[in-house]
Amino acid sequence: MSQTPEARTRDNQTRQIQESVNNVEKHFGELCQIFAGYVRKTARLRDKADLLVREVNTYADTETPTLKHGLKNFADEFAKLQDYRQAEVERLESRVVEPLKSYGGIIKLKREDLKVTLSARNREAKQMAQLEKTRQRNPSDRQIISQAETELQRATMDAARISQQLEETIDNFEKQKIKDIKKLFAEFVTIEMVFHGKALEVLTAAYQHIQDIDEEEDLEVFRNSLHPPDFQSRLDIVRANSRSGSTSRAPSVISQPPGNRQKNRMEDDEDGEDDNDENSTEDEN
């Protein structure tokens, strides 16, 4: 005995519902894993950024004033960005990943509903086969045939009722699925938009702090560090003393031209000879 048109329709509906449930289970599972991985990578990026902030602060402490100030301010802004990234991670986890995870339990319930429906279908098919056998074995026994027909009718009614319930359940499931997937992706986009909006604001401030670094001033500080003030003062004193000492030690004759110095020596010799002549004259008298 072949299936009735109603039974065939119910079977087709059940197969379609089963395929729909399998499809949701497969793709929601994949989406859940991918979104969870996205959140983990975002959290790791936050951790790496924290390390960057720490290193920038450590390096800034060794640098010249405006470079230090600029790097410190950059690090503060970048640390603020990581606070927003942490909020992004928490929101993605609670508003995207968790709702997808919850579909694991929902799918399990739908599979239970499918099992109940399939069991009802099997009972209907079994009663139909039993009625066919009864008619073949006892074609004249109306009582047994009537009893088998009653059992089949009861099984058919149960199968129809359960199929109707399953159809309503799956209809609600499909409606909720569409609503949830729409909300889920809207939440994802909103969370990312909020984060990137804040990121643009913070990174703009960080960029400005870097641009405010005065290269010339820092270079001048570095150059001055090569010649400490006390060393420069001592050097200036030594140079000044050297100049003044050379001036005070120079004899007056040094300033005379060589010709004058020779003339003076000749005059001194002539004066000495005149003195000797005068002494000799006095002795003769």
From Swiss-Prot:
PANTHER family given in the database record: CBY1-INTERACTING BAR DOMAIN-CONTAINING PROTEIN 1 (PTHR21223:SF4), CBY1-INTERACTING BAR DOMAIN-CONTAINING PROTEIN HOMOLOG (PTHR21223)
Keyword Membrane: yes
Annotated spans, Disordered: 241-285
Pfam families for this protein: FAM92
Gene expressing this chain: cibar1-b
Region called BAR-like, residue ranges: 11-221
GO BP, one annotated term: cilium assembly
Family the UniProt entry places it in: Belongs to the CIBAR family.
Subcellular location(s) of the protein: Cytoplasm; Cytoplasm, Cytoskeleton, Microtubule organizing center, Centrosome, Centriole; Cell projection, Cilium; Nucleus
Bias kind Acidic residues: ranges: 267-285
Domain notes: The BAR-like domain displays limited similarity to other BAR domains.
Protein name: CBY1-interacting BAR domain-containing protein 1-B
